[in-house]
Each structure stands twice: as structure tokens, then as C-alpha cells.
A protein has these predicted regions:
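N-terminal leader segment of winged-helix/HTH proteins
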Residues: 1-45
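Basic, amphipathic "hinge/linker" alpha-helix immediately C-terminal to the N-terminal HTH DNA-binding motif
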Residues: 99-122
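Canonical helix-turn-helix DNA-binding module
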Residues: 66-102
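Alpha-helical linker/hinge and terminal dimerization helices associated
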Residues: 90, 119-131
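N-terminal helix-turn-helix DNA-binding core of bacterial DNA-binding proteins
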Residues: 34-76, 106
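N- and C-terminal low-complexity/disordered segments
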Residues: 10-13, 59-61, 94
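Residue-level recognition of specific faces of alpha-helices
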Residues: 41, 50-56, 83, 115, ...
Length: 132
């Protein structure tokens, strides 16, 4: 088997043909793993407010607290809490609790989440020219 083509950065964008060639370059086992990961990611990001939460981190500088997200998003507190837990469990956010009174918890995007941030930039760029 030949080596798969170099994977361009997500911000570079791929034509349909390039994406197909890249996908087809993997052995069936690896291709199945990749497609399963994409499906799992889409399931997670398709949940209420998950995209909005990650988008906040994509354009934020540094950590965010629950209260920051609650102030910026029109999300129910219980939904926001659930999404933060799920995003943390998925390895997209780190949660740090500080031993203070009142208690303070901060969330920070992981490198795994930061690798998705160009996608949010593309979505915002797309929205400049398109409405739904």
C-alpha cells in the first residue's frame, strides 16, 4: 500500500475530489474508525447548544466560566451544564475547579477542540454571504 497523501490543514479547504482521494487512501479499518469518529462528533455537536458552546471557545481568549457562557448564550442552565460535561467527557474541554469561596470552575479548550476552531471560522465566513 502506498502512503496516504499528506493531510492539508482544515483551513486550507479540500475540493470534493481531494476529499474523496484522501478518504479512499485509508485502509478499510482506518476509514471505518475515521467515519465513526466523524459520526460521533456530529452526534455530539448536533445536541442543543453544543455548537454554540464550542463556538464561544473558538472566539474567546483563554478560559471561560459557566457564568460567562450563560451570559453570552441563550441556553437553559441545565442544558449548558450537560453540554459542558459532555464536551469535557469527549476530551474537547478541560474543567478546573478552584478551591475558593464561592466555588469557581473554569473551562479551557483542549488541543482536540482547538483543532476544530478553523471550522467555526469557515462557518462564520460562510454566513457572511449566506442566510438560512
Amino acid at each position: 500500500m502506498t502512503d496516504p497523501p499528506a493531510v492539508p490543514e482544515p483551513s486550507a479547504g479540500l475540493s470534493r475530489e481531494q476529499a474523496e482521494r484522501l478518504r479512499d487512501s485509508f485502509d478499510p479499518e482506518e476509514r471505518e474508525r475515521i467515519e465513526r469518529t466523524v459520526a460521533d462528533l456530529l452526534d455530539l455537536l448536533g445536541k442543543t447548544d453544543a455548537m454554540a458552546v464550542l463556538s464561544e471557545f473558538a472566539f474567546a481568549e483563554g478560559s471561560l466560566r459557566f457564568s460567562d457562557l450563560e451570559a453570552d448564550l441563550d441556553a437553559a442552565p441545565n442544558t449548558l451544564s450537560t453540554r459542558l460535561r459532555e464536551l469535557t467527557e469527549a476530551g474537547l474541554l478541560d474543567r478546573e475547579a478552584f478551591d475558593e469561596i464561592p466555588p469557581r470552575v473554569e473551562y479551557t479548550p483542549t488541543p482536540k477542540a482547538e483543532a476544530l476552531f478553523p471550522v467555526f471560522a469557515h462557518l462564520h465566513h460562510w454566513a457572511i454571504d449566506h442566510d438560512l
